[in-house]
Amino acid sequence: MNEYNFSDIEKSTQEYWRKNDTFKTIEDNTKEKFYCLSMLPYPSGTLHMGHVRNYTIGDVIARYQKMQGKNVLHPMGWDAFGLPAENAAIKHKKSPYEWTKSNIAYMRSQFDSLGFSFDWSREIATCDEDYYKWEQWFFIQLYKKGLAYRKNSVVNWDPVDQTVLANEQVVDGRGWRSGALVEKKEIPQWFLKITDYADELLQDINKLDNWPEAVKTMQINWIGKSKGLTVKFKVKDSNQEIEVFTTRPDTLMGVNYLGIAPEHPLALKEAKSNSQLAAFIEECKKTSTMEADLATQEKKGFKTSIKVIHPISAETIDVWVANFVLMGYGSGAVMSVPAHDQRDWEFAQKYNIPLKQVIESNDNKLKIDLEKQAFTEKGILINSGEFDGLNFKNAYQAIKKYLTKQNKGYETTNFRIHDWGISRQRYWGCPIPMIHCDDCGAVPEKEENLPVRLPTDVALTEAGSPLKDIPEFINVACPECGKPAKRETDTFDTFFESSWYYARYTCPTSNQMLDQEANYWLPVDKYIGGIEHAIMHLLYARFFHKLMRDQGLVKSDEPFKNLLTQGMVLKDGAKMSKSKGNIVDPQELIDKYGADTVRLFSMFAASPEQSLEWSETGVEGANKFLRKVFNYAELNKVIFAKNITLESQKLTKEDKKARFEIHSNLKQAIFDFDKSQFNTVVSACMKILNTLNNYDNLSESVKVEGFSILLRILAPFTPHLCHYLWQQLNLGEDILHTSFPTVDNNALEKDEFLLVVQINGKLKAKLELDASLSSNQVEEVVLADEHVKSFIDNKQVVKVIYVPQKLINIVIK
C-alpha cells in the first residue's frame, strides 16, 4: 500500500493549478458572483501563523462558494508603503522598493505553498505607480470638491520616526513603532472631510446586518454623535467670547471655571507676557493628545488673568489653561463643573477650586458626599435660580430657551470623530499631488502629469524624508501660472491606500480608477480580518466607498456585506511574537507535515472568531486524520475503478444506517459552512470517515458515495490531498470545479429508530423499533417486551409518557 507522501502530492497539485490557470476569474453574468477577500498583508518578509489562519479562512470560504457554482473572486495584494519598509531599508542598506519587492516575491511563494486559491492576475502592490496614480487622481477630485484641504494642526509628533501619528498610533504616550515619547507639534497637514459623512457613516451602520456587534459598537462610539448646547461665555473687559459645548446644560449654574487648551489663542496671547504660562504651554506639548491617555494622566493647569462672565448668573469665572483640553476638539474650551464631573472634581481638588452643587439625586435616601467624589448622575436642579426643581429633560429645554433668546447659546449636534489627517512626513509613501506656489497657493498637479512618481534612487537616513532634499523632485513650475514652485513633500497615510484596494482588484489594469467591472463584483460578499481594524481601516474604507459612490465610480453604499473578524493565534496563552520567544514558523510545519495538515489544524482547533491555542499535538492529530483518509482511498481504490452507482432498492440495513449518518453529517456540515463554523465542519468529516470504517459489510456503492461526499466537504480545507485522490479514484478531473454534495433526504428517513425506555425516570432498556409504528403500537410493543415486563410485573402502570421516536417513560407504583 502506498504511503501518504504529502510533499509529492502538494507539488504535483500546485503544478496542475499553475498549468491550468485554475484560479483565474473573469466576469460572468450567467452566474451568481461571490467576492471573498482577506485583508491584504504588509509584506514583512515571511508569513506567521496569524497569516496562515487568516488566509486559510478566506480560502476555505472561496473554495466552498466555488463548489456551490458561484463565480468567485479571491484576489491578493500587498499593503506595501509605510514606515516599517523605510526603517528596514535603512537597517539593511537597501532601497525600500528593493526590500519590499523581494519580500513580496518570497511571501507569494509561501502563499502558493499553502495552496491558496488567489487569482494572481489581479495582484496589486500599493507602491506600484499603476495603483497610486489613481489615488492621486482621486485626491485631486476630492480637493476640487472641497473635501480635501490643508490647515495648521496640532499633531502627535514622533521625534524618532520624524512623522505625525494618528491618535490610534499612540500607545501609552509613545509611538507605536519607535516607542519614543510623543510630542505635540503644530504643522501644516492635509485632511479629508470625513466629518461631512459622519451622519451617513453612523446611520448606515444599521445596514451592516452581517457585521459583528462589537465592531459596529466601536464605530458608533468612535463617530460619537451627541446633542447638546453651545454656550457663550463673554470675556470680561473684551468683545471676545469663548464658546463651549456641553451635553449637560442642567449643570450650567455649577460652572466654577473654564478650561482652555494650551494652544488656544487666548492662552498664547497671555503667554507672550507671562513666562510661567509660556513654560507651562511648552510642557504640555510633551503630553499625549490621545483621549484615553488624557483620562489617566495627571491633570495639570495654570490659572490665567482672563475672566469670563457667566451667561445666566453674570458671575465672574476664572479661566485656566489645562493639559486635558484639546484644541482640535470643539472650540478648544470646556466648561468645568467640579461638583458634577469627576475629571473637573480631581482638577478642583488639586488646585483648591470651590465646588457648587447644583444637582441633587432623585433618590432622597442617597447621600451625596462631594468631598469624596463628584455626583455625576442626572437628577433635580438646586441652587440654580429659576431652574430649581426641574429634572434633566425640562432643565435642558428651559436653559436652551433662555440662552437662545438672549443670544448666549444654541443647540448643537456634535461628533467625536474629526477630519482625517492624511499627511505623513516620510519618504516611503504615495506623494500627495499638490504644488505650492507663492502666487497661486496650493495647486493640484495636472491630471495628465500623473502619477507624481516617488523617486526610488534616494539616500535614506533616520532624519526624516529625503524628498525635500531632491531638487528634481521638489522644484517644479506652477501648473497655473508657470512660475517656480515647490512640490508637496508629504506622503499619504498608508490607510489611504488600504481604503480602496478592494475596489481596484475588480479592474487592476484599467486605465481609469474603476470601471464597470467594479459594479459587477462590489460590494465584497465576505471580508476577513482582525477586529483591531474596527475604527481605522474599516471606518476609512466605508468613508472611501461613499466618496467613490458620490464620484460615480461605484453604485453601492457600503463596501463589505459580511465581516468575519478572526481571533489571534496564541502559544502558552499569549499572542505569538518575537519578543516573547513563542513564534512558530509556518514553513517548518509545512516542511514537516505538509500544507494541508497546517491548514486543517488552523481550522479545526477553534472556530474562526475565537483565539486559537497552538498545539503540536493538535497538528499531529490533523496529520493522522489525513493519513487515515489517504489509507481509506488506498484500501478501496479497486472499488472506485468499477464506476459503481447507488441503487437504493439494493441497500442493506447496515447501508441505510451508514447513509443516515453520512447525510446527517453532510447536512450539519452545510449548515456550519454557511455559518463559518469551520471547526465543526471538520468534525463532520471525521465522523463520516468513522462511519465508513466502522461498518464491516457496507455495499461498495455506499463506500463510493460516502467517500466522495467526504472528499468534497474536506476539499476547501485540504485541497491538495482531495484534488489528488479525486483524480486517482477516477471521480473527476478537478474537485474544485465539482458541485458540492447535496443531502439526500431519503437517506434521513429511518426504517427503524432507537427508543430509550425508562421506568419512573430511570433507564431500563433500549429498543430498536420499526419507524412506521404508531404511538399506541409503540406502547404495546414496549409493554410486551420480556425485559421491560420483568420490571413492571405485579406493579400498577399509572401512566405512559411517550416522546415520539426518542423516549418512553412508564410510571408505576
From Swiss-Prot:
GO terms for molecular function: aminoacyl-tRNA deacylase activity; ATP binding; leucine-tRNA ligase activity. ATP binds at residue 578. GO terms for cellular component: cytosol. A motif ('HIGH' region) lies at residues 41-51. Keywords: Aminoacyl-tRNA synthetase, ATP-binding, Cytoplasm, Ligase, Nucleotide-binding, Protein biosynthesis. Belongs to the class-I aminoacyl-tRNA synthetase family. This is Leucine--tRNA ligase. The lineage of its organism: Bacteria, Pseudomonadati, Pseudomonadota, Gammaproteobacteria, Thiotrichales.
